[in-house]
Amino acid sequence: MPTREIRHPLIRHKLGLMRRADISTKNFRELAQEVGALLTYEATQDLPLETYEIDGWCGKVQVEKIAGKKITVVPILRAGIGMLDGVLSLIPGAKVSAVGVARNEETLEAHTYLEKLAPDINQRLALIIDPMLATGGSMVATIDLLKKAGCKEIRAMVLVAAPEGIDVVEKAHPDVQIYTASIDQRLNEHGYIVPGLGDAGDKIFGTKQKDA
């Protein structure tokens, strides 16, 4: 599936604020949650609905609810946690399935070091969240893991994506829809997205260097 770049004015505005070199941890964290929530709105807009009856103030009322599969949110640790509260603000009943993926900074290869999945994940729509889609290695490793666990429907949300990473994921898993706030220019020689956001994990957790 082709990657969807969500160019909503609110998303563009908030993402612009996140790109500032002097942004504080507090502001970066809050904006990551806000953009995560806005992307969730887009990524779930085609969920099926079913009608049921309730007792309203004026009698019986026909209302709607989401039908079919339930959702599990899959943050890729550690940076994915920064988007989690924003996503859960819209789907508070979702189960959280955490996946830890580390990238070798020399080879840029990804390896999984932790998985804590919902026990019924094979019956749920998996919504992967990670601020950055750079080389695509972490995303592919996570999707591989979820499919091995029996997931039939997987979607991914990222704040910014590099064309190189998109290409890797789309070739490895063409059935997975990616939603992003921005498709950026490229990866640099160190595997970082340009212009990107810098190291999103460091900025979310307050571990970035003063000159970062």
From Swiss-Prot:
Coiled coil: none annotated. Binds 1 Mg(2+) ion per subunit. The magnesium is bound as Mg-PRPP. It catalyses: UMP + diphosphate = 5-phospho-alpha-D-ribose 1-diphosphate + uracil. GO terms for biological process: UMP salvage; uracil salvage. Pfam families: UPRTase. It is an enzyme of class 2 (transferase). One of its GO terms (molecular function) is magnesium ion binding. Allosterically activated by GTP. Gene3D superfamilies: 3.40.50.2020. 5-phospho-alpha-D-ribose 1-diphosphate binds at R78, R103, D130, P131, M132, L133, A134, T135, G136, G137, S138, D199. The keyword Lyase does not apply. Keywords: Allosteric enzyme, Glycosyltransferase, GTP-binding, Magnesium, Nucleotide-binding, Transferase. Its EC number is 2.4.2.9. Pathway: Pyrimidine metabolism; UMP biosynthesis via salvage pathway; UMP from uracil: step 1/1. Uracil binds at I193, G198, D199, A200. SUPFAM superfamilies: PRTase-like. Its cofactor is Mg(2+). Belongs to the UPRTase family. Catalyzes the conversion of uracil and 5-phospho-alpha-D-ribose 1-diphosphate (PRPP) to UMP and diphosphate. This is Uracil phosphoribosyltransferase. It comes from Pseudomonas putida (strain W619). The lineage of its organism: Bacteria, Pseudomonadati, Pseudomonadota, Gammaproteobacteria, Pseudomonadales.
